[in-house]
A protein has these predicted regions:
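Extended alpha-helical targeting/anchoring segments
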Residues: 1-500
Length: 500
């Protein structure tokens, strides 16, 4: 626990000081914690990747104190706690001003995320950095950038069953430090009491056997004939030498009465992934389980994980191994993967120290719950004078969701795709108070706006692509998420299923 003496010492040097309380219990889960605090909770970040430090933790953000949102090509820093707003011309300036205003003492804890901005940057934000035409306006406006800086961060350690409550207390001249510390301790005690005394678990039950379905019942923004024709157009661009590859996508839609958190609870069970997230912004909810890192910046070290090449998981170890061998012998998949590794090297190379860029792992098989992929890891060391945000922008968006060469591919996609991509192909990320960044590519993700659910999926088109196969690939990818929607509706619309 943070003592008053420790708080007083830090309050003399910082504008925002973490007040921390930790306790152990084997009675709580992250889902219970979020449910108990659902009125204040705005995000949950999790991971199920054994090699990652993230897999030991779940992070829940409560009660935003500052948000950054893009509106009309301007960036609004909205200080929700102080009640004032600033307008700035760039995202980088908005973030740096926010860090300066908060001036946070970084918690001295061995956890991968120590507080900061959590949110998304949409694919369409690329028009702020590259000569890619802006996407047309849509009826439902979704900001290209939205970050939340929460007043309280809950950290759940899956291994030790320890829970940390980190409350970021802002020091000001209107109240004395004793009052600020006392109010912080009261807030922490209130949160702990609610966590430990919420005994209504009836809404948290899930069946042990999930009823699967093979139907596909989603509306698309693309007529099939146009999609097939656009695949041919991309192949013509490739033949003409404009590009090597482009990722053509279609967006699917359906209505649902289920909440985003209900969808997330089912998704985390049926499709555990390295990056799992539930984000809540006013009318928008984001639910996802992405397998692919966009960029990590950790103490000046850069890392990207290009993923390309997919096979289903085998029913037995023998079948699984056979499918993995087939994948590594597929010339089309290997060629695409090598191209994306080169893109990652170029992205990191623009912001890395000379000679520091290296491929630390090359074409290894990564196995997930339903599929396997070919994965590589590209690393580098951040160049002096280059900020972590500069590094992120250099890698954005991922080549795996755009194409190569990246800018020309995005220009062609903007010409062909009928609507804005919004979050699809962009990034879910945190920008830490400590300057670190971790981010994933926004794929295998659902967005929910006023009961309208959107799923988007793409296929990488190359010179020898078969249009029908590429179309079916997008259907297959979207079907995996539609299964989650169907299961969620089945479970929560018919609570009798819980008696199975």
């Amino acid at each position: 626990m943070t003592t008053y003496e420790e708080f007083l010492k830090d309050a003399g040097n910082y504008r925002t000081v973490p007040v921390i309380e930790s306790f152990s219990t084997d009675l709580l889960t992250p889902v219970q914690m979020f449910h108990s605090l659902k009125d204040e909770a705005v995000y949950m970040l999790e991971s199920q990747e054994p090699e990652s430090a993230w897999s030991n933790f779940s992070f829940i953000g409560l009660d935003p104190m500052v948000e950054i949102e893009e509106t009309g090509r301007q960036f609004i820093v909205n200080d929700l706690e102080r009640g004032d707003r600033l307008t700035l011309p760039t995202f980088k300036e908005a973030f740096e001003v926010t860090l300066g205003r908060l001036e946070v003492k970084i918690p001295d804890m061995d956890i991968p995320f120590k507080g900061g901005g959590v949110g998304y940057i949409s694919y369409d934000a690329i028009s702020d950095y590259e000569p890619v035409p802006r996407a047309p306006e849509e009826e439902v406006h979704i900001a290209n950038y939205h970050l939340l800086f929460c007043r309280t961060l809950l950290v759940y350690n899956h291994r030790s069953k320890e829970i940390h409550i980190i409350h970021f207390a802002r020091v000001d001249d209107d109240r004395d430090n004793a009052q600020i510390y006392e109010e912080s301790m009261e807030t922490i005690e209130h949160i702990r009491t609610r966590l430990l005394h919420d005994s209504d678990l009836s809404d948290l039950l899930l069946p042990t056997v999930l009823p699967m379905t093979s139907t596909f019942n989603l509306e698309s923004n693309y007529r099939k004939e146009k999609f097939l024709g656009d695949v041919e157009k991309i192949k013509n661009y490739i033949e003409a030498g404009d590009i090597l590859q482009a990722v053509l996508s279609q967006r699917f839609h359906k209505k649902t009465e289920r909440s985003g958190f209900e969808l997330y609870r089912v998704l985390r069970k049926v499709n555990p992934s390295p990056y799992m997230y539930y984000l809540k912004f006013n009318q928008l909810e984001v639910i996802g389980s992405s397998p692919e890192r966009q960029l990590e910046v950790q103490d000046g070290n850069l890392e990207i994980h290009p993923i390309a090449g997919t096979r289903k998981r085998g029913a037995t170890k023998e079948e699984d191994d056979r499918l993995a061998r087939e994948l590594l012998e597929d010339e089309k998949e290997i060629a695409e993967h090598r191209m994306l590794v080169d893109l990652a090297r170029n992205d990191i190379g623009r912001v890395a120290e000379y000679g520091s860029v290296a491929v630390s792992e090359y074409m290894v098989i990564g196995r997930f719950s339903r599929v396997m992929h070919i994965i590589s890891k590209v690393r580098g060391r951040l160049k002096a004078g280059v900020s972590p945000i500069d590094a992120f922008i250099s890698s954005f968006p991922a080549g795996t969701l755009s194409g190569a060469p990246k800018v020309r591919a995005m220009q062609i996609l903007r010409e062909l795709e009928p609507t804005a991509r919004n979050l699809y192909g962009g990034s879910i990320l945190y920008l830490g108070f400590d300057g670190n960044i971790d981010s994933c590519i926004t794929i295998r993700t659902m967005t929910l706006v006023d009961q309208n659910l959107y799923i988007q999926a793409g296929a990488g088109v190359v010179a020898d692509s078969d249009p029908e196969s590429e179309y079916q690939e997008t259907i297959n990818k979207a079907s995996a998420l539609e299964q989650t929607v169907h299961l969620t509706e089945k479970i929560f619309n018919d609570r009798n299923i819980l008696k199975v």
